[in-house]
Amino acid sequence: GGDLLRQGIATSMGAESLQIPLFGLFGACSTSGEALALAAMCVAAGYGERMLAVTSSHFGTAEKEFRFPLSYANQRPLSAQWTVTGSGAFLVGNKKSNVKITGLTIGKIVD
């Protein structure tokens, strides 16, 4: 799971009571895809029957950490993108289903 807060605090606090292993991810817009890919690879490798891929974000936090704090009162152009305040989750498992992950693409750095 992952989020946009420093140290992945929202994910860590949300998962604490579950008492299950956790990969803490921090990839901004890519966190959902990273979590889904990691969950699919873990299930395919037999590390678990079910994996939960979770991500969350918060507009105010994203502004504070990646752009300008809201208290700075920076003017935003009408075309500016806005970070959603929300969360999403996928349950990835090894049971037969019509919904399948058949492949994924992981990037690499080329200089």
Residues of each region from the PLM?
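General beta-strand structural signal in soluble alpha/beta enzymes
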Residues: 1-2, 24, 53, 101-103
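Conserved beta-ketoacyl condensing-enzyme motif
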Residues: 1-30
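Short beta-strand segments
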Residues: 2, 51-57, 92
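Short glycine-enriched loops at secondary-structure junctions
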Residues: 2-7, 57-58, 97
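Short acidic, glycine/serine/threonine-rich loops at helix termini
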Residues: 9-12, 62-67
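Active-site-proximal alpha-helical scaffold in enzymes
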Residues: 26-51, 92
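Membrane-interface helix-loop-helix junctions at boundaries between adjacent transmembrane segments
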Residues: 48, 62, 70-73
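Condensing-enzyme catalytic core mediating Claisen C-C bond formation in acyl metabolism
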Residues: 68-111
